[in-house]
């Protein structure tokens, strides 16, 4: 059955945690949603508009291999020193990333191998309407597509407010 044309794309928020804090992922055989165990600390960034998560599958009959490349393109629209400091740490780390879309779906990226920053920019813009902020690309190669989580993860209470 073809669904109605009411889809709404985009990412609402992105959460990062240190790699190694999740001890297991259990996938429900009926719902196919996953539950994570472990207690990583999650750091949240609210995003809107120009961030995206894309997963591509690469499969080779000749080699007998299949893997999924998870790519997060992240745009943060405010330039400040505290956020820059956190992003510099993320750029050299290999975090887990949870992406929440506008339907409330939470996707766990990088469970087996972590996600790695493959590039980005710190930009002031040239014109009044240009981006003044950060762009980062994170990529992970996994045996599965990102897991749909059965519940949202809770962010740490100490979050950066770039406008404060």
Predicted stretch roles:
Residues 21, 41, 52, 79-81, ...:
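Generic "edge-of-domain/loop-turn" microfeature
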Residues 76, 99-101, 111, 140:
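Hydrophobic side chains in beta-strands
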Residues 114-164:
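Mixed-charge, glycine-accented linear interaction segment located at domain edges/termini
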Residues 87-109:
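Short, acidic/charged, Gly/Pro-enriched secondary-structure junctions
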Residues 81-88, 147-149:
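Short, conserved charged micro-motifs
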Residues 64, 87-89, 98-99, 126-130:
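A general structural signal for short secondary-structure junctions and capping/turn motifs
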Residues 60-82, 130-144:
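Oligomerization/assembly interface segments of phage tail-like spikes and tubes
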């Amino acid at each position: 059955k073809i669904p109605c044309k009411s889809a709404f794309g985009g990412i609402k928020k992105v959460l990062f945690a240190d790699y190694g804090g999740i001890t297991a992922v259990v996938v429900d055989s009926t719902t196919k949603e996953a539950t994570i165990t472990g207690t990583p600390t999650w750091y949240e960034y609210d995003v809107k508009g120009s961030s995206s998560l894309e997963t591509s599958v690469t499969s080779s009959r000749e080699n007998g291999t299949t893997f999924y490349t998870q790519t997060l393109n992240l745009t943060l629209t405010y330039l400040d020193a505290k956020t820059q400091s956190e992003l510099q740490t993320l750029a050299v780390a290999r975090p887990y990333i949870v992406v929440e879309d506008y339907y409330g779906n939470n996707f766990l990226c990088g469970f087996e191998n972590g996600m790695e920053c493959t590039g980005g920019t710190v930009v002031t813009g040239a014109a009044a309407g240009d981006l003044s902020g950060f762009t980062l690309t994170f990529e992970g190669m996994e045996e599965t597509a990102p897991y749909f989580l059965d519940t949202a993860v809770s962010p740490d209470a100490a979050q950066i407010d770039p406008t404060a």
